[in-house]
Amino acid sequence: MSSHADSKPWTVPALAQAKREGRKLVMLTAYDAGFARTFDAHGVDLILVGDSLGMVVQGHDSTLPVTTADMVYHTAAVARALDRALLVADLSFQADATPERALDAATQLLQAGAEMVKIEGAGHKLEVIRYLVEREIPVCSHLGLTPQSVLRFGGYKVQGRGEAGEQLRRDAQAVVDAGASLLVLECVPTPIATQISADLSVPTIGIGAGPGCDGQVLVMHDMLGLDSGHRRPKFVKDFLAEGGSVAGAVRAYAQAVRDGSFPDAEHAYAA
């Protein structure tokens, strides 16, 4: 279980304190109350209602068809089940195209029970992050492989190799300067993600970004070894195989994140 007092709900300031104290953060996606309740009870610190639901729940080939209404529905379902974990919800594709649109979508998500919203990218998104934070809405940034940009990237590919790594470091500092309280790094080479994590004052959560991040996240279907209908990424590990039950898998995943045994080199990307 988490070293954060089991009866004490996670808060945004507590995340930063965990980083200062060197305590790894455990995050999983969830899309309904049943799984969310199990994850919350067995050591998960943060729950992400991700727009990944478009692929693993709705059966689409990308996250692009997901709407704000979809996100609000699933966020509300998950929120009803949580006692401890901090709830993060994605802004869906183009919901953050302008600060005003982002505020409308974020307001709906917070009213549904989210405690933080996640925004992909930097660039013009810095204005959106600042706009939301100035209006008391906590923001998690998402850099590296940002699935909403899959068309521009030409597929799901590792980001931040070579000179792109320095740009990623600059973007990471920029989103924190804009007010982000948390940063997800996806499909980033381990050395770059480790350096970014050392650079920043806020926690980093890795997914395919190596063990040097301040925490880890997986899509729940991947953590449980379920067939999502898509190619299995390198960074995925089936914890149900060793855990024996959903609760056991969650405990095994949480322990592996906290003791640093996951991810190992087999589940990460070199420079």
From Swiss-Prot:
Metabolic or biological pathway, per its Swiss-Prot or TrEMBL entry: Cofactor biosynthesis; (R)-pantothenate biosynthesis; (R)-pantoate from 3-methyl-2-oxobutanoate: step 1/2
UniProt-annotated binding residues for Mg(2+): D51, D90, E120
Catalytic function, reaction form: 3-methyl-2-oxobutanoate + (6R)-5,10-methylene-5,6,7,8-tetrahydrofolate + H2O = 2-dehydropantoate + (6S)-5,6,7,8-tetrahydrofolate
Class of enzymatic activity (EC top level): transferase
Record localization: Cytoplasm
Residues at the catalytic site: E186
Keywords: Cytoplasm, Magnesium, Metal-binding, Pantothenate biosynthesis, Transferase
Pfam families: Pantoate_transf
Enzyme Commission designation: 2.1.2.11
Family to which the UniProt record says this protein belongs: Belongs to the PanB family.
Role noted for this protein: Catalyzes the reversible reaction in which hydroxymethyl group from 5,10-methylenetetrahydrofolate is transferred onto alpha-ketoisovalerate to form ketopantoate.
NCBIfam families, sorted: panB, PRK00311.1
Protein name: 3-methyl-2-oxobutanoate hydroxymethyltransferase
